């Protein structure tokens, strides 16, 4: 009989979400197995053991997850083959004997999502459902913390978002929700949660809040698709990546991310954090 471990396994511990979740679980005394590509970058947390296991290396993932009952899967970095990387990871997790996989997905994940990167999440969810493992899906909205990054050097947010609205969510709220699920995974088996902020905002409203927080003049300029492609051509990014960036805006314009839910509060016991509060200077 395979020996079971009390450890919870996490991917993405060197990133913004996985690192936050790992820290929260460590403070609760949960022993952790951190699946990373570079162990030197793994957070130094009590009870945490880093293990090298890239998503695409099924053998390494299977070995890293041996004996683990519960794992938290944060998606790999955006790549042309990300969906296949995810499927490889899921199959390896199931083969390793993982019983419950908690996956950080994306709001409205579907193979038909306008936001092209969300399609990878749909493929991943399908693989998890078919794996035989128990599962919980945490579908988050766009990160509130990233809104300042949409602003160009000229103080303009550009994109074909029209009058669409998006309920951006704080990374700390996502981490709180994920930690709550991982502390009692059985209570959330077979559940899908949509994690949003407390209000659906237009890009004009987002620009105003970012400007207020940064002390600079920020505005939003609605682009056509041709204008959006032209304004991003200088980055030298591959076509699939540029399409993903642009579809961030077209998905909002299509109304696919305007939903506001109470799932953050239901899981964490506290209300979702408004964008203005997320961007407020510390102290």
Indicate residue ranges for each PLM-predicted region.
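Oxidoreductase cofactor-interface core, primarily capturing Rossmann-like NAD(P)-dependent enzymes
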Residues: 2-45, 56-69, 77-87, 91-100, ...
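A hydrophobic C-terminal alpha-helical subdomain
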Residues: 226-283
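Residues lining the SAM
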Residues: 11, 74, 269
């Amino acid at each position: 009989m395979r020996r079971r471990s009390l450890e919870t396994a996490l991917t993405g511990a060197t990133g913004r979400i996985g690192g936050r979740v790992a820290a929260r679980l460590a403070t609760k005394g949960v022993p952790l197995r951190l699946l990373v590509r570079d162990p030197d970058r793994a957070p130094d947390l009590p009870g945490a053991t880093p293990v090298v296991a890239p998503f695409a290396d099924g053998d390494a993932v299977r070995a890293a997850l041996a004996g683990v009952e519960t794992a938290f899967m944060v998606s790999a970095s955006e790549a042309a083959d990300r969906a296949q990387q995810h499927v490889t990871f899921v199959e390896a997790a199931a083969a390793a004997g993982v019983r419950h996989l908690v996956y950080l997905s994306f709001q409205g994940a579907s193979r038909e999502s306008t936001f092209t990167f969300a399609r990878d999440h749909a493929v991943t969810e399908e693989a998890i459902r078919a794996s035989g493992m128990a599962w919980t899906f945490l579908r988050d909205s766009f990160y509130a913390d990233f809104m300042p990054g949409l602003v160009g050097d000229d103080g303009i947010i550009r994109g074909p978002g029209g009058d669409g609205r998006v309920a951006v969510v704080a990374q700390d709220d996502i981490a709180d929700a994920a930690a709550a699920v991982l502390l009692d995974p059985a209570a959330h088996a077979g559940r899908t949660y949509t994690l949003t902020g407390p209000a659906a905002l237009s890009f004009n409203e987002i620009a105003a809040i970012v400007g207020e927080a940064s002390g600079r003049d920020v505005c939003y300029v609605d682009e056509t698709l041709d204008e959006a492609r032209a304004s991003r051509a200088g980055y030298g990014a591959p076509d699939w990546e540029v399409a993903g960036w642009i579809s961030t805006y077209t998905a909002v314009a299509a109304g696919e991310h305007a939903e506001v839910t109470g799932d953050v509060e239901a899981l964490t016991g506290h209300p979702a954090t408004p964008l203005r509060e997320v961007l407020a200077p510390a102290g």
